[in-house]
Swiss-Prot record:
Lineage: Bacteria, Pseudomonadati, Pseudomonadota, Alphaproteobacteria, Candidatus Pelagibacterales
Subcellular location, principal: cytoplasm
Catalytic activity annotation: AMP + ATP = 2 ADP
Pathway assignment: Purine metabolism; AMP biosynthesis via salvage pathway; AMP from ADP: step 1/1
Protein's cellular compartments: Cytoplasm
Similarity comment text for this entry: Belongs to the adenylate kinase family.
Superkingdom of the source species: Bacteria
Positions of region (LID): 126-162
E.C. numbers: 2.7.4.3
Transmembrane feature ranges: none
Protein name: Adenylate kinase
HAMAP family: Adenylate_kinase_Adk
Amino acid sequence: MNIILFGPPGAGKGTQAQSIVKKHNYFQLSTGNLLRDEVKSKTDLGVDIEKLISNGKFVSDEIVNTLLRQSLTNLKYRDRIIFDGYPRNVEQAINLEVLLNEFNQTIGHTIFLNVSRDIIEKRIMGRMTCEKCNMTLNEYFNKEQIELHPCGVEHLKKRKDDNLEIVISRYDTYMSSTKPVLEFYSKNSNFTEIDGAGEIDQITNKINEILKV
């Protein structure tokens, strides 16, 4: 069964998705990673995406849907996909249903990690990602791990779009645009809301219990 993980930027969707991948042999389809890969490719589309992200804006549905379709046609895992960061609005939710129907697939569980803006601010402003191994640490919560990071502290970098004004803008935009999507999926009995402010392991255990159902 496929899964959708909802939650504002910094809610820990990526961390939880990685846990599901390891434990349940899922494939993580992150629109954030798709967009960043396109930016790294230096294509014209990638340049446009970088401008939008740097200004705290979301890219258009047309761009996201194009990248998503390209990925779906290359997926090796049927009915074992975690959609991380998609859909963001009702139009995308409808588009996802259409795409999955083309591949004879459906959504088995929809999970919303609910986290307040105050906590999100600290999580994102302190977030650092290793440019070599992609490990993510937080300067507020992982000071010892940062000092002992095997790749070296010099490889831990902050993302360009991680500044307070943009964090607030992204959070408010996400919550306002995603509310209709949550209402769209909450009508389904497979929709679950989880307090995303807890410890990572506690949240992981809750998700594992959901996936057993």
